[in-house]
Amino acid sequence: MSDKAPVTMLDVARAAGVGVATVDRVINRRAAVRPQTAQRVLEAAERLGFRRVGLIRSRVVQDSRPRRLGFLLQSRRTPFYRSFAAGLAAAARQGEPPVECLIEHLDDLTPRHVAARLGRLAQQVDAVALVAADHPTINQAIEAVVAQHQLPVFACVSDLTTQALAGYVGVDNRKMGRMAAWLLSRLCPAASKVALLLGSHRYLCQEQCEISFRSYLREAAPQFHVLETLVSLENPQLAQNAVLELLHQHPDLAGIYVAGGGIEGVVDALRDTPQPRLVTVCHDLTDITRQALLDGTVTAVLSHPLPAMAHALCDAMRQAIDSRRSQHRLQNLLPFELYSAANV
């Protein structure tokens, strides 16, 4: 029976010319280690016959392959999500280190379908980001992914309430809603009637925009009358019908804030009406909203800074992959952009 003492982490560290903490990081992935350093640790462990050499080898192999980021976005038919997807692909290529990017678009936004697609995507990537409604089924799916795959999951565009998230990257929707209210209060006649259109109350971003919009007018322009909120379910046809009915019922309407999807339908409705042009504020600069600004159908656009948001999200996901044990929840709020016919 051999009296030789077992090889320790200290022995491996000395043979590799690194500290014990570095060997621990390679084994337990507590933090990022440069590939060259990890390879030295592996070679030293193999030479010495370290009992955990198999684990070190698997870690080195895992860490040597390109990272893959997964994104679950909404319909490709929506100009905003086409642009966001292009920005994410560019950010993945340009960042350091470059990563692979797997982007999936959803037409079916029912919570059960979103949850199922999230579960499948999580099996193919190292980190996930999604745009989703704040629904218990979706939040439970995120918690299951984090528990089963030890995978960082981020919310983007619209935050979520589950504590399992690694973070949120987007704009400050409270400020966005207040800015919309400020614009309407300055551009509409005093004591006007104004309307608000959402895609769904389930999206926290839209809920926050609505709350802050109403809050600002209540605080700074109480003479304004805000009508009951309309909901489009992110559907352009429903949005068009809702606005046409709104204009029929309220011919004295002075302004409208479109805080959700379906802007294509809203623009069509406003162009078809013989009534005087409304002060219209909506979200996100696309080919459709740019043209609507230029022809006067839309007054102002509050827009997500898509290239900056894509880079911030990819950077956050890279960092989360390399520090999986971090309990810190990232909150990255980027400033939104304001466009009118004067600066598009």
Q: Model regions: which residues?
A:
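N-terminal helix-turn-helix DNA-binding module of bacterial transcription factors
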Residues: 1-57
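Amphipathic helical "hinge" segments at domain boundaries
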Residues: 52-116
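Hinge/beta->alpha junction and helix N-cap segments in small-molecule ligand-binding domains
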Residues: 74-81, 103-113, 134, 169-178, ...
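Short helix-capping segments at alpha-helix termini
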Residues: 94-98, 148-149, 217-224, 249-251, ...
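Hydrophobic alpha-helical
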Residues: 127-146, 231-288
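Flexible loop/hinge segments that line or gate small-molecule binding clefts
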Residues: 137-175, 286-294
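A conserved helix-loop-strand patch within extracytoplasmic ligand-binding domains
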Residues: 176-195
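Hinge/cleft segment of the Venus flytrap/periplasmic-binding protein
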Residues: 217, 306-344
